[in-house]
Each structure stands twice: as structure tokens, then as C-alpha cells.
From Swiss-Prot:
UniProt-recorded name of the protein: L-seryl-tRNA(Sec) selenium transferase
Gene that this polypeptide is encoded by: selA
Role of this protein: Converts seryl-tRNA(Sec) to selenocysteinyl-tRNA(Sec) required for selenoprotein biosynthesis.
Assigned protein family: Belongs to the SelA family.
Main location: cytoplasm
Species name: Clostridium botulinum (strain Hall / ATCC 3502 / NCTC 13319 / Type A)
Length: 462
């Protein structure tokens, strides 16, 4: 059949609305949703005809496509996915998972009115920052604290407050890109601080900073390169040295430690990453860090440091534009409460638990998952192997965590096709593919995920 005839044969919406099955959906759903889904179905077939992808179709084909489209339109676009990649803080999959206490706190303040900006004791308007400031001070040792909506905003607000139309001196090797093409120099530009690069990519000395200090210098800035590492012939100025230099010239020292951990991971066998507490103990005036990376909480930019600087930031007009919402505050409060006891934090905050849980635990879990798959899924090969997980989220660059995985292959379907089908399934499962094998890393899986994985594997060859 020629293209023109195929286009003429496309059914009209009014015609499809008379179909019994479409009428059933019309009784259960709004007319707008049904008509939009019918239009999408007709448009799909029109496009396929114009691209010469089909040479025939039936009204039944159009109706079946309508049913799938309607169900897709009814479903939410923001979906739960199962992370089998072994990347704990997966940037594209929502970064950190919240602790149970944080989730309960969010639900409580979301389904009820709350004292977001109301001082119950005084009976008058209060500050939204008061709900978490004392907690942040307690777990970090800071004089003062505040929170904005992400760490880039925290850096921008701090620089704008300390350094508007003045110079911020920073090492050339610390001008990082933090993902999505957002770069420290660009954030500085929007803060209206003037960037002064010193040193070289791999080596910066104290005299590089000192030689560039003048009457227009506003801040000495240190940026932790949390998402990459320079090895070999390197030199950088320590926080202590910068604090001494700042004191000599009466300049504030600011440090952005990015992923922002409150736990010293070197105690657990990892490479040392600067903690928020250590930066403050060294005398750094202002420290900024993320809430949804190593902290294991919601997306937030946390600013801690000297009270005189934090108070100025709270009064900055930018603060209202960057302020945090009630649900994030509730999640952050619930997360921070766990940190009152480090052992409790490691046990209850999923990010910390996943990173620090032992390889032996995951060996047993991988064996359980393999048994369930073998007992319920035919035509696939399953084996347990040692492998390496990643922290992710631009944290601990180069660090790999020994783990156990389930490797999968089949003579009847390629690894790439398995990956695609799992990703597009009703319960999306995100996996790794390597050397013609699908890899399921149990470090980032929950026990509740195992049954879902088995059920989705059962459907792969249907």
C-alpha cells in the first residue's frame, strides 16, 4: 500500500472513541487524557508512515498503542529505580538515600502545618534556619551555621558576602568543574567576586597567595578537589598555612570541601578526606559543603564558620532566593540527628552504611541473590564474583571498594539487550555491563530489591 493511502487509512479520534475498549477507558479516565493518548497514538503511526517504517497497520494496532500510551501518561515521570551499579552516591540516580528518621520527619512536616518560621516559645515570627543551626553546630563544632539549597549556592552566597567586587585568591589547580558544566570560576563570576588565579595546575606555594594580596583582596579561597586527584610532582598550601596568612593580613579564609564528610573515613581503611570538623579546628573562617553526598542527607548547601560572617550571609538579599524549603530542612534535621553518635550514623544513614559495610556481608548477599535467580529464571547463567564498587557523587576520587557481584549472561539474549530491557522495565533496574556480562552489584541493593529483580528477569525472554 502506498504512503498516501496509509495516511488516508489512519482512523479519526471520533471513530476510535466509538470502539468498545476505548469507551471502557473513557469511563475510568478523564476525556482529556483519553483523547490526548489517542492523538499520540495516531501521531505515532503517521510518523512511522512518513518515515517509511511500516507498510501496513490495523485499527487494532492503533488502539493497542493507545492503551500503552495511556498507561504511560498516567504513570509518574519521577520513578523509583533499583541501583545495581555499585555506585553508592549515584549522581544521576538521586545521590544519597535518606535515613528512616529523615523520611519520617519529612512526612510529618509535609502532611501537617509546621513551625517553619514561627517561634513557638515567643509566639512570633522565627527563623527557618533555627531548626538545624544548633544541630549543625553540635556535630561540626562551628560557631554558627546556615543552609541554602545546594553547595554551589552556598559558595556563591559566601563569596558575594565576603568578597563582592573584590578579589578572591585561589589556586589554579583548584578551579574544578563540579558536573553539568558548572565550574568554580563561573560560580565566582556570578557571586561578583573577582577571581585571582595563583600557582600552577600541579604546584601552588604560600608565596603565590601572599604575592597577590593587595588592598582589594577580599578572601583567600581553598577548594577541595573532591572529584579528581593530581598525583606525582604536586604541592598545595595547607589550611593551617592559609589561616596564618589570612591572620597576618586580616583576611577571611574560606574553604569549599564539596562532598563534605563528618566522618573520618581513614579510620575505616579509606584514603583520608578532609572533614568539616578538621577544617574548622584548623581555624578556617567559613566552610561550605553539600548535604546529599558524603553527609547522606538531602540536597543542600551547608555553610559553617565564624558567627560574624554567617550573620552577614543571613542578611544578604541573595539568601531569600537561595533559601531551603521545609521538606529539605526536615530531612536535614533527621539526618543530622543521626550524627550525634557516629556509630548510629553509620548504622542508619544508607550512604554511610553502603560505603562502610564489609565485603563478607556482600558475599553472602550476592550468593542469596544468585540462588533466587537460579531457582526461578531459566536460560541464564549466574555466578558470584569479586568486584569493585565506587563511592561516586564526585567523592573520594580513585577510591574503589571491594565487593561481590552477580554476573549474568545468556546464549539467547545479549548483555546490552538485557541492560536495555531491565532499564525500560516496569520496575527500572540500572546495571553495569562488562565483557558481555550484566553485573549486579549487591552493595547498592536492598533485600527488598531481590524479588523485583527475579520477577523482571523472568520477563526478559518473553
Amino acid at each position: 500500500m502506498d504512503k498516501k493511502q496509509l495516511l488516508r487509512n489512519l482512523p479519526k479520534i471520533d471513530e476510535l472513541l466509538k470502539e468498545e475498549i476505548v469507551n471502557r477507558y473513557l469511563q475510568e479516565n478523564s476525556r482529556t487524557l483519553v483523547v490526548d493518548s489517542l492523538r499520540q497514538s495516531i501521531d505515532y503511526y503517521r510518523g512511522e508512515i512518513l518515515k517509511n517504517n511500516i507498510d501496513s497497520f490495523t485499527k487494532e494496532n492503533v488502539v493497542n498503542y493507545f492503551i500503552d500510551t495511556l498507561e504511560e501518561n498516567k504513570s509518574t515521570k519521577f520513578k523509583k529505580v533499583i541501583n545495581a551499579t555499585g555506585v553508592v552516591i549515584h549522581t544521576n540516580l538521586g545521590r544519597s538515600l535518606l535515613a528512616k528518621e529523615a523520611i519520617e520527619n519529612v512526612v510529618k512536616v509535609s502532611e501537617n502545618y509546621s513551625n517553619l518560621e514561627y517561634d513557638l516559645k515567643e509566639g512570633k515570627r522565627g527563623s527557618r534556619y533555627s531548626h538545624v543551626e544548633e544541630l549543625i553546630k553540635k556535630v561540626t563544632g562551628a560557631e554558627a551555621a546556615m543552609v541554602v539549597n545546594n553547595n554551589a549556592a552556598a559558595v556563591m552566597l559566601a563569596l558575594n558576602t565576603l568578597c563582592e567586587e573584590r578579589e578572591a585568591i585561589v589556586s589554579r589547580g583548584q578551579l574544578v568543574e563540579i558536573g553539568g558544566s558548572f565550574r568554580v570560576p563561573d560560580v565566582m563570576k556570578f557571586s561578583r567576586a573577582h577571581l585571582v588565579e595563583v600557582g600552577t595546575t600541579n604546584r601552588t606555594h604560600l608565596y603565590d597567595y601572599e604575592n597577590n594580596i593587595n588592598e582589594n583582596t577580599g578572601v583567600l579561597l581553598k577548594v577541595h578537589t573532591s572529584n579528581f586527584k593530581i598525583m606525582g610532582f604536586t604541592e598545595e598550601v595547607s589550611s593551617e598555612e592559609m589561616v596564618q596568612l589570612g591572620g597576618k593580613y586580616k583576611l577571611p579564609v574560606m574553604e569549599d570541601i564539596g562532598s563534605g564528610t563528618l566522618v573520618d573515613f581513614s579510620k575505616y581503611g579509606f584514603t583520608y578526606e578532609p572533614t568539616v570538623q578538621s577544617s574548622l579546628e584548623k581555624g578556617v573562617d567559613v566552610v561550605t559543603f553539600s548535604g546529599d553526598k558524603m553527609l547522606g542527607g538531602p540536597q543542600a548547601g551547608i555553610i559553617v564558620g565564624k558567627k560574624k560572617y554567617i550573620d552577614k550571609m543571613k542578611k544578604n538579599q541573595l539568601t531569600r532566593a537561595l533559601r531551603i524549603d521545609k521538606m529539605t530542612l526536615a530531612a536535614l534535621e533527621g539526618t543530622l540527628k543521626c550524627y550525634i553518635d557516629e556509630k548510629e550514623a553509620i548504622e542508619n544513614i544508607p550512604t554511610l552504611n553502603m560505603i562502610l559495610s564489609s565485603k563478607d556481608i556482600h558475599k553472602k548477599r550476592a550468593q542469596r541473590l544468585k540462588r533466587r535467580l537460579q531457582n526461578n529464571v531459566k536460560d541464564f547463567n549466574f555466578k558470584v564474583s569479586e568486584d569493585l564498587s565506587m563511592v561516586g557523587g564526585g567523592s573520594m576520587p580513585g577510591e574503589r571498594i571491594p565487593t561481590y557481584v552477580v554476573k549474568v549472561n545468556s546464549d539467547k539474549i545479549t548483555a546490552e539487550k538485557i541492560e536495555e530491557k531491565l532499564r525500560l522495565s516496569k520496575n527500572p533496574i540500572i546495571v553495569r555491563v562488562s565483557k558481555d556480562e550484566v553485573i549486579l552489584d549487591v552493595r547498592t541493593l536492598f533485600e527488598r530489591d531481590f524479588n523485583i529483580i527475579v520477577e523482571e528477569f523472568k520477563k526478559l525472554l518473553k
